[in-house]
């Protein structure tokens, strides 16, 4: 399988040439150096297998010399990708087609058998497989809740706030007739599993130099149905610290009993995060 994983057979990293198209970006990543491309690691779990590959690109005559942040020497560029193979479930999950009036993450699907249909789109929304214990009741406990695990690297100062925020989603699910649809646990310090195992939905603690958002996905779905199989959420340290700083500076939150929850009581960690 080396010819598949150690090449661009699964995912094209280099941009294709567009005849007549504008060359707005002078940076060229170069050619794939197959002799330097390698597996970083291979991880096997009960329901998924991950191949992490480091692709190396060589460009002896670059026209752009990079930057002091992401790339110091453009003559050699490393790109790391993870290829994941996930076991698909066999169940009675019923896909739900997208309604363009409501925003969802979707799997785009085109019905190739509808030759006369001007809009042959059958996009499926991404959603969890939540089932009622008592389907005949308007409101019922769920058979299997969505369980989120707070990663054990998360500072203790923030764990209760994170748990409270996630569990607040139960109010929305109750409106849909699903009781206790979301559960939150803390990953034990001696856990024999890690976030790479798709069976665990993990709220991961991270510290990036310039994150695009305070929290972001991804989730993993069955492309045939749209069922969400698992998800990890990256929680950025800088978002929490900035939130507390802005709150102290601008006194954004009210101390009223019915007002938003305030986190000014939190003591920020003094550890330097790299």
Task: Identify the function of each model-found stretch.
Residues 153-181:
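Zn2+-dependent metallopeptidase catalytic core
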Residues 1-154, 172, 181, 187-266:
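Auxiliary tRNA-acceptor-end handling modules of aminoacyl-tRNA synthetases
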Residues 265-274:
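Single conserved hydrophobic/aromatic residue that forms the stacking wall/gate
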